[in-house]
């Protein structure tokens, strides 16, 4: 069968369905003219980045200044693999500032490294942080630490004037994880139990006294008698000056993503939480309500911004699996509710965690990290010489977010520097292509074992496979061919024909002989012959064909 015949099949209705769903993408140089035509079939010119936005191994881009905070254990190992395999081949990372926040290094420097990292973050404004360990008493002994180390997060939130911790669901086209559409969450970054002072006390009287800074007379906020022999007293407060910027960030993000916003408190019991809701509602009514109405985004919630009691929010998170909503809450409620979102959406590995603060000049400071920990169990397996299979998706989303924010800040600070503007465009093209390469690897059944089962790739093999696919996609951009855009069978097709996607995936694996996630011309031909779908030559065409 000729290359031209293949093109005719691809442009038929059935052919388009096969090509789109399976991502058939020619890889043989033997049919180069057809390869270009088939590649163009998958996208319009608008899908292809401009030439100046492309980069390659031979044309490294100087990455903009960024703070890179190293952590511990398996996630540190995985991030090292990712940076070496996916970033260093394409970027000069010499402008990044590195800080090692491992327990041992924090202990050796008496936590000066943490203070230095916070200072650098204030200055640069774009930070990536690997998961770190806040050592328990047992870990302190195991690591041989001199000092008791607290969580670095409090110092970071204070030093970067933290406003909110944005936690959003991560989605892979074609793979249903939990929520079908995005779910956004804004967690107030300061206040509450996380900054509390406390002490163990016995019987007595506890006074909480407020001393105004303007010289007014102090007064007692709370007085209580402690009659138990053993008590723990806790004091904390909730700063509300930054709730207004939190509201603007939240509502604008929901508006941009076309999702419906909700505000969560327990103000019916905790009367002091009324102020949070009041500020959010005022900002919404004055600046955003009409814009949400224009988009029809309030129809699902009675035509206005809705308040949810935190107890009710826990139930709705389980029920609203179609997604398409956002929530904003206090620090502690936000922590608990986003853990629940992670469970509905498969795992914390599919949730982002971005701290947003504000620099003195008004620009946003953004710190990006995965919402999971250091994955100690896999680290212990790795140290024991066992195979591991860590899904780095959350880590990579954080690196991508930090890299993009760094590029935006650098271009904004240097608007007349064409090299900075060009680098920003190149970085956004690269990160988009990286996401496509990583997501397609999962979709081809070549993911880690949490996604692909026992036959899934190891940590190292997955990184290598994505690196191979990333280079392939970037190289293809120079040839005017974009990364393949995998399409889903239409919902109408699924409904009418009861599509068995597992069986289809098995069929794809059967004909993808070399397991690279592509069906080339030869494999495609073999598949059509086996299925009795190959177009046959007419008698007239057969007579003309030479017998060789």
UniProtKB/Swiss-Prot annotation:
Residues 1-53 form a transit peptide. Residues 499-534 form the EF-hand domain. It is found in: Mitochondrion. It catalyses: D-threo-isocitrate + NAD(+) = 2-oxoglutarate + CO2 + NADH. Its main location: mitochondrion. Mg(2+) binds at residues 311, 335, 339. It comes from the Eukaryota. SMART domains: EFh, Iso_dh. The homodimer exhibits allosteric regulation by isocitrate. Activated by Mn(2+) and Mg(2+). No activation by Na(+), K(+) or Li(+). Inhibited by Co(2+), Cu(2+) and Ni(2+), but not with Ca(2+) in the presence of Mn(2+) or Mg(2+). Competitively inhibited by NADH, but no effect on activity by 1.0 mM citrate. Strongly inhibited by excess ATP, ADP, AMP and alpha-ketoglutarate. Changing residue 512 to A: No effect on secondary structure conformation or specific activity, but rapidly decreased activity with increasing Ca(2+) concentrations in the presence of Mn(2+). GO terms for cellular component: mitochondrion. GO terms for biological process: isocitrate metabolic process; NAD metabolic process; NADP metabolic process; tricarboxylic acid cycle. SUPFAM superfamilies: EF-hand, Isocitrate/Isopropylmalate dehydrogenase-like. D-threo-isocitrate binds at residues 151-157, 187, 194, 266, 311, 335. The keyword Disulfide bond does not apply. Binds 1 Mg(2+) or Mn(2+) ion per subunit. Its cofactor is Mg(2+); Mn(2+). InterPro entries: EF-hand-dom_pair, EF_Hand_1_Ca_BS, EF_hand_dom, Isocitrate_DH_NADP, IsoPropMal-DH-like_dom. Homodimer. Belongs to the isocitrate and isopropylmalate dehydrogenases family. Performs an essential role in the oxidative function of the tricarboxylic acid cycle and respiration. Catalyzes the decarboxylation of isocitrate to produce 2-oxoglutarate and generate NADH to provide electrons for energy production. No activity with NADP(+). The C-terminal EF-hand domain is required for homodimerization. This is Isocitrate dehydrogenase [NAD(+)] 1, mitochondrial. The gene is IDH1.
């Amino acid at each position: 069968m000729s290359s031209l015949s293949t093109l005719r099949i691809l442009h038929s209705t059935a052919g388009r369905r096969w090509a789109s769903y399976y991502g058939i993408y020619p890889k043989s140089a033997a049919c180069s003219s057809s390869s270009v035509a088939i590649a163009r079939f998958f996208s319009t010119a608008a899908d292809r980045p401009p030439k100046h936005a492309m980069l390659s191994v031979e044309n490294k881009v100087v990455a903009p200044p960024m703070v890179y905070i190293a952590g511990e254990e398996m996630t540190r190992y995985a991030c090292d693999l990712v940076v070496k395999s996916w970033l260093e081949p394409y970027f000069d990372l010499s402008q990044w500032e590195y800080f090692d926040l491992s327990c041992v290094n924090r202990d050796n420097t008496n936590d000066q490294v943490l203070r230095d990292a916070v200072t650098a973050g204030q200055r640069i404004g774009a930070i990536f942080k690997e998961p770190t360990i806040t050592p328990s008493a047992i870990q302190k002994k195991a690591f041989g630490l001199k000092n008791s180390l607290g969580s670095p997060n409090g110092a970071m939130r204070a030093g970067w004037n933290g406003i909110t911790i944005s936690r959003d669901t991560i989605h892979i086209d074609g793979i249903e994880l939990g929520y079908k559409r995005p779910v956004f969450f804004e967690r107030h970054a300061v206040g509450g139990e996380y900054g509390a002072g406390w002490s163990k006390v016995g019987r007595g009287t506890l006074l909480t006294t407020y001393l105004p800074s303007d010289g007014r007379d102090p007064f007692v906020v709370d007085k209580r008698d402690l009659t138990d022999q053993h008590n723990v007293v806790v004091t904390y407060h909730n700063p509300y000056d930054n709730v207004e910027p939190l509201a603007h960030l939240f509502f604008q993000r929901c508006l941009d993503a076309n999702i419906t916003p909700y505000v969560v408190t327990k103000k019916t019991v905790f009367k002091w939480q009324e102020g949070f809701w009041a500020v959010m509602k005022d900002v919404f009514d004055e600046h955003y309500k009409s814009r949400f109405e224009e988009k029809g985004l309030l129809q699902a919630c009675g035509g206005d911004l809705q308040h949810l009691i935190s107890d009710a929010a826990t139930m709705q998170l389980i029920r609203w699996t179609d997604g398409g909503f956002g929530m904003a809450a206090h620090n502690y409620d936000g922590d608990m509710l986003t853990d629940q979102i992670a469970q509905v959406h498969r795992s914390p590995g599919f949730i982002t965690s971005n701290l947003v603060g504000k620099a003195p000049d008004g620009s946003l400071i953004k710190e990006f990290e995965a919402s999971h920990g250091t994955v100690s169990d896999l680290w212990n397996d790795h140290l024991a010489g066992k195979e591991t299979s860590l899904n780095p998706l959350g880590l990579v989303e954080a690196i991508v977010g930090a890299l993009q924010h760094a590029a935006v800040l650098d271009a904004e600070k240097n608007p007349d520097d064409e090299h900075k503007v060009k680098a920003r465009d190149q970085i956004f093209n690269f990160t988009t292509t990286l996401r496509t390469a990583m997501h397609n690897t999962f979709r081809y059944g070549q993911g880690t074992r949490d996604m692909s089962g026992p036959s899934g790739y190891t940590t190292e093999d997955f990184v290598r496979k994505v690196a191979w696919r990333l280079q392939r996609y970037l190289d293809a951009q120079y040839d005017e061919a974009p990364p393949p855009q995998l399409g889903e069978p239409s919902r109408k097709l699924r409904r009418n024909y009861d599509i068995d996607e597992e069986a289809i995936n098995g069929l794809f694996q059967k004909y993808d002989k070399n397991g690279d996630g592509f069906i080339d011309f030869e494999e495609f031909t073999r598949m059509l012959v086996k299925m009795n779908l190959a177009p046959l030559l007419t008698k007239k065409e057969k007579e003309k064909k030479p017998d060789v």
